[in-house]
Swiss-Prot record:
Annotated positions binding ATP: R220, D221, E222, Q229, E477, G529, L530, D531, R532
Species classification: Bacteria, Bacillati, Bacillota, Bacilli, Lactobacillales
Source species, domain of life: Bacteria
Binding site for L-aspartate: E174, R220, H443, R484
Protein's name according to its UniProt entry: Aspartate--tRNA ligase
Tagged with keyword Transmembrane: no
Matching CDD domains: AspRS_core, EcAspRS_like_N
Role description: Catalyzes the attachment of L-aspartate to tRNA(Asp) in a two-step reaction: L-aspartate is first activated by ATP to form Asp-AMP and then transferred to the acceptor end of tRNA(Asp).
Family, as annotated: Belongs to the class-II aminoacyl-tRNA synthetase family. Type 1 subfamily.
Species, as recorded: Streptococcus suis (strain 05ZYH33)
Pfam families: GAD, tRNA-synt_2, tRNA_anti-codon
Region of interest (Aspartate), residue spans: 198-201
GO BP, one annotated term: aspartyl-tRNA aminoacylation
Length: 583
């Protein structure tokens, strides 16, 4: 029979109606000769009642045979419950079953199909189709669908054109490693799966499309963490003839619409703007979480005269104050914080506690001459904990920034109900790579330098600033964008600054440089990480929770066993020979 409605949508207004439902058995229980079944489908749970006095013996026998996750079809009459269950939307009614059909049986599942399970990540991924049956997972994907629907409606209304760009493209140096696809036709040659549609969307601007968007899969072969996957989805935008503020206005409107449509939240516009240098110096991060204070404070000049070489001879001394936390952290706890600080390059972590107006701790004796100034500078109060890092500026900022985030979580300083957006602007164009021994693009090599600093491309690259902007939400980089270079001579100059020879630049990017001979318009854009955005809206802490079939931390799929070996005949057809290094 045809299903009448979803089980989770049956309500009091359906009382007296005969309906047919289909779904999975959540649980079965007997009471006083009656059998009660929780029938689950994607919209929720409905209680079924099977009374031996009102059904045939065959129906009763089928009901007694049911186990969790059997797939069934039932027909019956909706009645009002004698005792309502206010914990579920269908709790005012139940279905008095008259017929029952078992559509399929099920083995005992490796974990219960319910929220809050304790199964390991790999077990959940191994049986992902079961994991996705759980209501909290299903709700995440309903949210994701609502987000993409809202995005498409917004961009369609602004006359953006949805264009699909190639999945098989050319390998170009963009930062992370490419996933390579060997060509059978052109043996010895490889496609790359795109890390982003960056160049192709710029070429669409040269084609006169004016406003492009795409919700697109991207691929990066990089080390994984909670908010990264080897394949991910981004909301990709590009526009012609707009400046950075106009592009930011469009993105702010998009985000405001998504939050209103999906969460019922009104977002205050415009978003705050913060310079990159300010973010690093006061938050220790280029993606600061502004839901709490605990700012980094520079004490370099104040501690120059103390009799403590770790401070007096350090390039920079910075500190954070954890208000009222002195009694929360024992020496052993601070040792753990010190070990954590060393992960970010710090040599150690100095600390003092405020105890009745006096400083206590290993370095307190060195600070007696500046106690009053230090107390005033840091606005210290009783029971405060002060953590110091003395090192190079970058190390001090990164270390204290990481500690700031960790301590805020441990101290419960974060209001999880807040959605704090901001723009990080005034970016450096380049960042120095110790590993490579050269400057690298902070974003990508197509970013437009500011008019005031472009002349440094032939000199001090540290002075070049970019017309770039990242959007940050609650300490996560939600997306990044920039105005792009549209003049051939400047693009060639940029490649040269990055260490490309003229031959290498034309080998890698000749098609883009050639396109710049044909009236390339001023343009710019942005990409938002869709997985990360939905993760934050859903209140999750790992993007695996909002990706249907993600990989684990080894970039593997425990369900399909991908990646896997392939037959030697396939390798021969591709003219490939695999040599494995000894482990």
């Amino acid at each position: 029979m045809k299903r009448s409605m979803y089980a989770g949508r049956v309500r009091k207004e359906h009382v007296g109606q005969e309906i047919t439902l289909k779904g999975w058995v959540g649980r079965r229980r007997g009471l006083g000769g009656l059998i009660f079944i929780d029938l689950r489908d994607r919209e929720g749970i409905m209680q079924l009642v099977i009374n031996p006095e009102s059904v045939e013996a065959e129906v009763m026998a089928k009901a007694e045979s049911l186990r969790s996750e059997f797939v069934i079809e039932v027909t019956g009459t909706v009645v009002e419950r004698e005792q309502a269950n206010d914990n579920i939307p269908t709790g005012a009614v139940e279905l008095q079953v008259t017929s029952l059909t078992v559509l399929n049986t099920a083995k005992t599942t490796p974990f219960e199909i319910k929220d809050g399970i304790e199964a390991s990540d790999d077990t959940r991924l191994r049986y992902r189709y079961l994991d996705l049956r759980r209501p909290e997972m299903l709700n995440n994907f309903k949210l994701r669908a609502a987000v993409t629907h809202s995005i498409r409606n917004y961009l369609d209304d602004l006359e953006f054109i949805d264009v699909e760009t190639p999945m098989l493209t050319k390998s170009t140096p963009e930062g992370a490693r490419d996933y390579l696809v060997p060509s059978r036709v052109s043996k010895g040659h490889f496609y790359a799966l795109p890390q982003s549609p960056q160049i192709t969307k710029q070429l669409l601007m040269n084609a006169g499309f004016d406003r492009y968007y795409q919700i697109v899969k991207c691929f990066r072969d990089e080390d994984l963490r909670g908010d990264r996957q080897p394949e991910f989805t981004q909301v990709d935008l590009e526009t012609s003839f707009l400046n950075e503020v106009e592009i930011q206005d469009i993105v702010e409107g998009l985000i405001a619409k998504v939050l209103k449509d999906t969460k019922g939240i009104d977002v205050t516009l415009p978003f705050p703007r913060m310079a990159y240098d300010h973010a690093m110096n006061f938050y220790g991060s280029d993606k600061p979480d502004t839901r709490f204070e605990m700012l980094l404070q520079d004490l370099t000049e104040l501690v120059k005269e103390v009799d403590f070489k770790v401070f007096s001879e350090a390039p920079v001394v910075k500190a954070i104050v954890v208000k009222g936390a002195a009694d929360s952290y024992s020496r052993k706890d601070i040792d753990k914080l010190t070990d954590y600080a060393k992960q970010f390059g710090a040599k150690g972590l100095a600390w003092v506690k405020v105890d009745k107006g006096e400083l206590a701790g290993p370095v307190a004796k060195f600070l007696t001459g500046i106690t009053e100034k230090l107390t005033a500078s840091l606005q210290l109060e009783d029971k405060d904990l002060v953590l110091f890092v003395a090192d190079e500026l970058e190390v001090a900022n990164n270390t204290l920034g990481a500690l700031r985030n960790r301590l805020a979580k441990e101290q419960g300083l974060i209001d999880e109900s807040k959605f704090n957006f901001l723009w990080i602007v005034d970016w450096p164009m380049f960042e120095w790579s110790e590993e490579e021994g050269r400057y690298m693009s902070a974003h990508h090599p197509f970013t437009l330098p500011t008019e005031e600093t472009a002349h440094h491309l032939d000199g001090d690259l540290a002075q070049v600033r970019a017309v770039a902007y990242d959007i940050v939400l609650n300490g996560y980089e939600l997306g990044g964008g920039s105005l792009r270079i549209n003049q051939k001579d400047m693009q060639e100059q940029m490649f040269k600054a990055l260490g490309f020879s003229a031959e290498d630049a034309h080998e890698q990017f000749g098609f883009l440089l050639e396109a710049m001979d044909y009236g390339f318009p001023p343009h710019g854009g942005l990409a938002i990480g869709l997985d990360r955005f939905v993760m934050l809206l859903a209140g999750e802490d790992n993007i695996r929770e909002v990706i249907a079939f993600p990989k684990n931390n080894k970039a593997s799929d425990p369900m399909t066993q991908a990646p896997s070996t392939v037959a030697s005949a396939q390798l021969e057809e591709l003219a490939l020979d695999i040599t494995l290094e000894n482990e």
